[in-house]
Amino acid sequence: MSLPNPFLIRPAPKKGKKGAPLVLLHDGGGTIFSYLQLGALGRDVYGIHNTRPGPTGVWEGGIAQMAAEYLDLIKTVVPSGPIIIGGWSLGGLVSFEMARQMAASAGSSSSSEQLQVLGLIMIDSRHPSTFTDKELVLPDSIKPAIRESIQHNMTQSRQLIRDYSTPSWPQGSQPPPTMFLRATRDLDGVPLPIQADAASSTRNGRMEGWREYEHDFIREVVEVEGTHFSIFEDQNIGELDKKLLAACKTLDRGVKS
C-alpha cells in the first residue's frame, strides 16, 4: 500500500471548534479502505494500515507488539494532548491494548509530553472469547495481489485474536471510557436482539462478550445498521457516520468512568 502511515483520512475544519484527533486502526484485512468512506467528523481523522502486510509480514509479539509499533506511529502525527483511538474489528482490540500500554507507562514523562486518551471507539470489536472464524467474502473486482495480501492478513489476524488474552489494567487505573458501535445483524443477516439479557440492559444492548471482563469500561452500546461485514457499505455508511460523530462528541465532552 502506497498510502502514508498514518494517513490523514479527513482533516479538521479550518474554522470553528475542533474535536480531539481520532485515530482508527486497520481491520483484520490490514487495510483502511473502509475508513476512507467516512465523512467529516469535525476533527483530524487518521488511519493506520498494517505495517507488515502480505505473506512476509509476521507479528511474532502478537497484538501487544502491533499496539506498541502503532503507538509510535501515532506520536509522529499527534505527539501529545487529547486523542481518541479505536477501530473496526481487530482495530478495536489493538486500540484497547494500546491504551493499556499507555496506562502502564504513565508517569514516565511529563504530562505535557503525554497523549491523553479521552476514550476508545470499538466498531463491532468482539471480546476474543466470542470470536468467530466466519470469513469476509471479497469482491471479484479486487486485484489478485491485493486479494492475496488481504487474505493473508485475515488469516494472521484470526490467529492474533485467538492468542490475545485481555489483560488486567495497571493497578490504580482502568480502561478509558469506551463507545461500542455494534452491528444490528449477525453474520447471516438475522437481526440481533437489542437487549441480550437483564444484566446487559443497563448498557443498552449486547456487549459481545465484554460484560464478563473484569473492568466495566463500556459506557454505551450504539446500534449501527448491518452485519459485521456490511456496516461500511453504501447503504449503511451514512448512519455510521452520524453515530461515529456522536460517539466522538460524547468522548470530547467527557463521560463518567
From Swiss-Prot:
Keywords on this record? Hydrolase
- How do people use this protein in biotech? FR901469 inhibits the activity of 1,3-beta-glucan synthase from Candida albicans and Aspergillus fumigatus. With minimal inhibitory concentrations (MICs) against Candida albicans and Aspergillus fumigatus of 0.63 ug/ml and 0.16 ug/ml, repectively, FR901469 displays greater inhibitory activity than other 1,3-beta-glucan synthase inhibitors such as, WF11899A, echinocandin B, aculeacin A, and papulacandin B.
Q: Which Pfam families match?
A: Thioesterase (PF00975)
| Pathway per the UniProt entry | Antifungal biosynthesis
| EC number(s) on file | 3.1.-.-
Catalytic class of the enzyme? hydrolase
Which molecular function terms from Gene Ontology are attached? hydrolase activity
Record function comment: Thioesterase; part of the gene cluster that mediates the biosynthesis of the antifungal antibiotic FR901469, an inhibitor of beta-1,3-glucansynthase, exerting antifungal activity against the pathogenes Candida albicans and Aspergillus fumigatus. FR901469 is a cyclic depsipeptide containing 12 amino acid residues and a fatty acid chain. The NRPS frbI contains 12 modules responsible for the formation of the depsipeptide backbone which is denoted as Acyl-Thr-Ala-Tyr-Val-4OHPro-Thr-Thr-3OHPro-threo3OHGln-Gly-Thr-Orn-OH (C71H116N14O23).
Protein family = Belongs to the AMT4 thioesterase family.
- Protein name, please? Thioesterase frbE
Organism per entry: Dothideomycetidae sp. (strain 11243) (Fungal sp. (strain No.11243))
